[in-house]
Amino acid sequence: MDKYQKICNEVRKTYPSLELDNIIKDIRKAVGLIGIDTRESDMKYLPPIFGFIRGCVFIEKGNPVIFINATLEPNAKRYVIAELLGYILLYLPADNIDPNHAYYLKLDESKEENIKINETLYYFAAELLAPTEEVYSDFLSYGKLDYNAIDTIAAKYKVPKRIITNSIKKYLDQKSGGENHDV
């Protein structure tokens, strides 16, 4: 079990509404039950300097609010919610939140610290939405390498296919001691 699996297990223990079945059924409701509102926006109010924004976190009356770009596909919206939830739980300064500040997931990729944050948020979101162990178990149930299985599993967890292929690869890498596997 890697650190992201441990983090997500701890998050699920701390916030029972974030159990996998609840996340699959309605991630917005599950996140709302821990006091985090989610809303959609076309993001047109942001200056063009920001480029394309998939989502951001605003603070409203002391509570974080996740805004998702309304132009995204439904599964991409779910992923952005999970990623921003990770940002809130893992990085947002709980005791020093600036109520006049928006927190964006647009980090300067030239800084190593930001690369690590992006990586952490990707793996957190992937693990929260489609736990590695369960994805691999679902994949094994097909009995052979079947790329249609990837589509079916992605539909089950309501995530982009790359999340499923990366989870399977991650599982194989963990079990083989770190050897790289292609899926």
Regions found by a protein language model. Name each.
Residues 1-183:
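Active-site hotspot residues in diverse enzymes, especially metal/ion-binding acidic/histidine motifs
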